[in-house]
């Protein structure tokens, strides 16, 4: 069998996979390229690579595809269509517009994409207007926390999506303390394990460093950055049209119940914070921002687009003409 191509980031991530594949001590992760990157994706890669019959490297990456397809099929559980043909059509269409062979070349974006899609499926059963449902909240937080072990930005997504989930519950501050404590304890646990077992915990870029302080005082430079980021946002939305579907869904959803309205409000706030986070990341980065935007922002945006997919399914569920005629 010919080996599917490893792309640029894949050559960094495979080094982590090789540490696990060769049964090396986990501390050896500090000596590979980009040691500050989280390693769970590399462990999964190595596990399925080592336990495959032929032990081809790309067999480990096949799990990423399996995880992705499985997450897409969670649509079945919430779609209230009378016609199975429509369900299959929707699932097939989602795969067509979200499948990117390039990202299966060793990139970790699909792990974030699939994790958020599965988490959002569980969030649809949360009733924000009742007392906090601890068991459901803890399950969702557990699912979301895995993102921290896939990519650096996973921690910030965990804070955005998990924090909002707790904050918007119709409960007292006292009742929200426990899940908030669990969330921050989970973040601290990841920090502690990486710092004290692997030996390193840091991000790929410095936050609000001296270079950023210099730039922030230059209004014209910041404006040029914002314009460039916005331009590449539009390019990314065209490249991954699921975002276009998400935005139109947010704009045109109507005739929804109180429970659905709360879910929609949660998604809207998450969307705003999600977008602001991306702007903040690229405004903060001191590197050649035009080049950086051209090679990264599409992937950064793609990995969170799945979270808002259920708004589109909600619209289809409400459209009886569509759901009953196919």
Task: Give each language-model segment a name.
Residues 2, 167-170, 175-255, 271-279:
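Membrane-lumen/periplasm interface segments of specific transmembrane helices
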Residues 68-80, 166, 238-268, 310-312, ...:
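Hydrophobic, aromatic-rich transmembrane alpha-helices
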Residues 102-111:
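Short acidic/glycine- and proline-prone juxtamembrane loop motifs at membrane-interface regions
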Residues 111-129, 143, 307:
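Specific aromatic-rich, kink-prone transmembrane helix
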């Amino acid at each position: 069998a010919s080996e599917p191509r490893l792309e640029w980031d894949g050559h960094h991530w495979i080094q982590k996979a090789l540490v696990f594949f060769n049964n090396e001590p986990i501390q050896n992760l500090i000596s590979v390229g980009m040691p500050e990157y989280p390693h769970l994706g590399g462990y999964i890669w190595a596990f399925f690579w080592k336990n495959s019959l032929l032990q081809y490297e790309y067999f480990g990456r096949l799990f990423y595809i399996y995880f992705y397809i499985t997450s897409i099929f969670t649509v079945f559980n919430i779609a209230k269509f009378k016609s199975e043909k429509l369900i299959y059509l929707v699932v097939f269409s989602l795969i067509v517009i979200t499948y990117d062979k390039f990202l299966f070349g060793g990139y970790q974006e699909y792990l974030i994409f699939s994790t958020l899609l599965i988490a959002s499926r569980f969030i649809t059963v949360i009733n924000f207007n009742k007392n906090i449902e601890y068991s459901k909240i803890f399950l969702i937080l557990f699912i979301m926390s895995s993102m921290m072990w896939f990519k650096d930005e996973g921690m910030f997504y965990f804070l955005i999506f998990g924090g909002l989930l707790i904050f918007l519950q119709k409960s007292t501050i006292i009742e929200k303390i426990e899940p908030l404590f669990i969330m921050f304890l989970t973040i601290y646990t990841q920090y502690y394990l990486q710092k004290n077992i692997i030996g390193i915990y840091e991000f790929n870029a410095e936050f609000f460093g001296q270079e950023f302080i210099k730039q922030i005082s230059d209004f014209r430079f910041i404006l040029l950055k914002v314009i460039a980021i916005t331009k590449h946002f539009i390019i990314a939305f065209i490249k991954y049209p699921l975002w276009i579907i998400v935005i139109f869904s947010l704009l045109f959803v109507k005739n929804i119940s109180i429970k659905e309205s709360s879910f929609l409000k949660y998604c809207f706030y998450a969307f705003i914070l999600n977008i602001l986070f991306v702007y903040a990341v690229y405004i903060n980065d001191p590197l050649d921002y035009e080049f950086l935007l051209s090679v990264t922002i599409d992937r950064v945006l793609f990995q969170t687009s799945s979270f808002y997919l259920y708004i589109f399914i909600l619209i289809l569920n409400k459209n009886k003409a569509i759901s009953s005629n196919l």
